[in-house]
Amino acid sequence: MNPLQEVIFCRQFGNQHRVPKPYYRRKTYLCYQLKLPEGTLIHKDCLRNKKKRHAEMCFIDKIKALTRDTSQRFEIICYITWSPCPFCAEELVAFVKDNPHLSLRIFASRLYVHWRWKYQQGLRHLHASGIPVAVMSLPEFEDCWRNFVDHQDRSFQPWPNLDQYSKSIKRRLGKILTPLNDLRNDFRNLKLE
């Protein structure tokens, strides 16, 4: 595994609403750990989008090759800069469904195009299929830093307002994952008639 450079980690995993100066393009990076249920690390790597192939699809290919033994259970933790698009969400659900010996958890730094219905549906589909999607907060950023960054033995230094940004993104994800039936009931309870 080639560890991420510190500057790449801070720029790409930064959860600020706006890119700080100097401006740069935020790309998708996916860092994952493949472990046995008792915690033994089998493999870890950092992936990113490649020529019209999303990082999630590269991840599926890698995991397929590493987990051929279906008698062995595996746990996978993913740290990703952007939450999956609807297509990748669908592919991840199908992959985990076809491989019941795998357990997958996703931690996203930011929500990708979260205001669009299809992207919200993708997140709901992951959640309903038993693939938890959560927002990265300080412990996840620290773990990602320790395991995937060439940090030269320096500890993670949170950027300003990291906690506030995480809480804001978590609230948004919570609203997306709230079943619509609950919202309908809330409107009925308003008794606007």
UniProtKB/Swiss-Prot annotation:
Changing A65I: In allele A3Z3; haplotype 5; confers resistance to FIV vif-mediated degradation. Transmembrane segments: none annotated. It is found in: Cytoplasm. InterPro entries: APOBEC/CMP_deaminase_Zn-bd, APOBEC_Cyt_Deaminase, CMP_dCMP_dom, Cytidine_deaminase-like. GO terms for cellular component: cytoplasm; nucleus; P-body. Keywords: Cytoplasm, Hydrolase, Metal-binding, Zinc. Changing V96I: In allele A3Z3; haplotype 4 and 6. Changing E56A: Probable loss of catalytic activity. Fails to suppress FIV infectivity. Changing R68Q: In allele A3Z3; haplotype 3 and 7. Expressed in peripheral blood mononuclear cells. It catalyses: a 2'-deoxycytidine in single-stranded DNA + H2O + H(+) = a 2'-deoxyuridine in single-stranded DNA + NH4(+). Its cofactor is Zn(2+). Residues 24-126 form the CMP/dCMP-type deaminase domain. GO terms for molecular function: cytidine deaminase activity; RNA binding; zinc ion binding. Its main location: cytoplasm. Zn(2+) binds at H54, C85, C88. Its EC number is 3.5.4.38. The active site is at E56 (proton donor). GO terms for biological process: cytidine to uridine editing; defense response to virus; DNA cytosine deamination; negative regulation of single stranded viral RNA replication via double stranded DNA intermediate. Pfam families: APOBEC2. It is an enzyme of class 3 (hydrolase). DNA deaminase (cytidine deaminase) which acts as an inhibitor of retrovirus replication and retrotransposon mobility via deaminase-dependent and -independent mechanisms. Selectively targets single-stranded DNA and does not deaminate double-stranded DNA or single- or double-stranded RNA. Exhibits single-stranded DNA deaminase activity (in vitro). Incorporates into the released virions of the virion infectivity factor (vif)-deficient feline immunodeficiency virus (FIV) and suppresses FIV infectivity, probably in a deaminase-dependent manner (in vitro). Belongs to the cytidine and deoxycytidylate deaminase family. Homodimer. This is DNA dC->dU-editing enzyme APOBEC-3H. It comes from Felis catus (Cat). The gene is APOBEC3H.
